C-alpha cells in the first residue's frame, strides 16, 4: 500500500469510529426525542457545534451547496390510509381500545389535513429553508455583500418537482430580504437533471435492496404488544401485523413535518418498539440509498456527475472565469445521500454488510433529515490568494479522509474529489 492509500485508509477508520460513537447514542436520543426516530422523515433540526476559527488572513468568497427539499406531506394517500383501514374496521365493530380510538382520531386528522397535498412542501419546509438561508447569510456576510459596488450573483437550480422548486424559492426569498441588492437566477430545467437527479442505479437495484430491507423488518419488528393495546379480542384479524406496525409508525412520523406535533402518537409505542422501528427505517435507507457493501457501489457512483459539477463550477469561480457568489442546488434525499457517501463524510462513510451492525455506525436522521444540506465554503487568503474549502453537512463540519481539515487546501480537496469521480 502506498503512503497516500495508507493515510486515506487510516483516516477512513477514524471516520468510521467517530460515526460509530455518534450512532450508538441513537437509543438514548430517541428516548429523549422520539421524533428523531422518524429518520429520513425527521424535520430539520439545527444542532450547532463548536467551530474551528477561520485561518488568519482568509476571507470567504464563494459557497457551493446541495440541499434536500424541506419538510413535506407524505408522497401518497396510501401512506395515510394503510394503517387507518384496519383501525376503521375495528371501530365499526366497536373493537378498539381507548388508545386505539385516540390513535384513529389523530390518524384521521393527519389524513384529512394531507388530502390533495401529497408530496407538497409544508409551511414548516418553507421555514426550514428560510432559516438555513439566513444562517448562511449571517455566517458568511462577505459572500453576500454588495457594498462598494460589489456584485453578488446567486445561481440556483432545482429538480422539476414542485417541493424542490418551492424550497429554492424560499431560500432565495430570504436571501433577497436580507440584501435586496443580491442578483439571483432561479432555474428548474431538464437541462440540469443529469447531475441534479442522476441516480439510475437505484431503480435497477430496487427489487433486491427492497427485499433485503423487508427481511430486516420481518426480523426486527414484534407487533404483538402494540396490536393488543389498540384492538380488543373482538377486532377483525390483521392480515399483516408487522406491516400495520410499520405503517402506523410512518403515519405518526409525518406529524412533525406538517407542524402538527399534537397529532403525533409516539406514546402508543414503547421505547424498545420505537428503537426497532427507527433501526428498520434506518436499514432500509442504508440499503436503498446508502453506501452498503451489498448494494452501495453503483448508488454511490451515481453522485459523480453532481460532485463533478460542484468541483468544476468552483474551479471556474476560483480561476475568475465566472463571477458567482453562490451556487445553490435543490433536490432529494436519493441524490444527497449518495453525494455524502461518495465524499466519505464522517456521518455517512460506513460501509458494512451485516444488517445488525448498521444501527451502530449509520444514522439516517444525521445524514438526510428533511432540508438536509451539504455546503462547501470557499476562502481566499487576502495576500497570497491561497484557497481553502470548508465542508459542512447539515451546518456541522464534515470530516473527510484527507489531510488539512476542516479548512482543506483547495488543491488537496480538488484532487481528492477528482479521484472519487474517476474511480
Cite the ranges covered by each PLM segment.
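Signature for phosphate-centric chemistry
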Residues: 24-155, 159-327, 331-423
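N-terminal signal peptide c-region/cleavage motif recognized by signal peptidases
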Residues: 18-22
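Bacterial N-terminal signal peptides that target proteins for export
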Residues: 1-10
